[in-house]
Amino acid sequence: MNKLKLSLFTVLLIFSVGCNQQKKDTGSVIHIDNIVDLTHTLNSDFPFIPVRKLTYPFELIPMATLDKNGVEANSWKIHEHLGTHTDAPNHFIANQKSLDQIDLKDLIVPVVVIDIEKKASESSDAELTVEDINLFEKKYGKIPDHSCVMMYSGWEKHLKDSLFVGLDNKQVKHYPGFSNEAIKFLVIKRNIAGIGVDGLSFDPGIDENYTGHKTLFTAGKWGVECVANLNKIPKTGATVIIGAPKVGKATGGFSRIIAVW
């Protein structure tokens, strides 16, 4: 009888310790006080970089309806670089990672936001420069290793007008972006995971050679474009989660991007 009591006590003790450990482990996984959606809703009006015979607006095409088929379903007409989306390194560089090959640990990273809204309000061709990075770090501290650096230019306020693409009468685009020197600095000196912008491209619109894309992707980093609500997250201290679609050989894709802290 005493042996039975001892055995029961031992089992209960082990169970109790196990439950307490499970509670402890579960409670320490992650704690989120704030969450912000950094993704624009994609629809047929969403602007895109115009490339003759290549790019086109998003289209939602009904496939089935509840009335006719007993189920509601749509197909999408979409190219990889529409809406809030992720660019993979193979977008410009041969033999680099495709979207599905980007490691998950590189898609959940610290995020910092560098504000150039004042410059962008004065010039559509404004650039985020190394000087802007230095000024940011003097105020907020060094940009963390393996982080995402977002440029906030306030450009999303132009989403529904022609300034977002900024085509002039020679069909040259005008919108803010990172300078190539800034991207080089972030890749070499700060070992970033990726960068992002609230405009159409992280290269300024006037750079039709996409110099910054090539610099970033040669280093195997990713970029996100048309990011929303960057003015609603802290300049430092948040984590960004890049919900890039896992499509084999993709050079990019519409993504759900969120910030938490």
Go through the PLM ranges and name each one.
Residues N20-W261:
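Active-/binding-site microenvironments in catalytic and ligand-binding cores
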Residues F15-G18:
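C-terminal motif of bacterial Sec signal peptides marking the signal peptidase cleavage site
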Residues N2-T10:
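Sec-dependent signal peptide recognition
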Residues M1-K3, Q21-Q22:
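Intrinsically disordered, low-complexity sequence elements enriched in Ser/Thr/Gly/Pro
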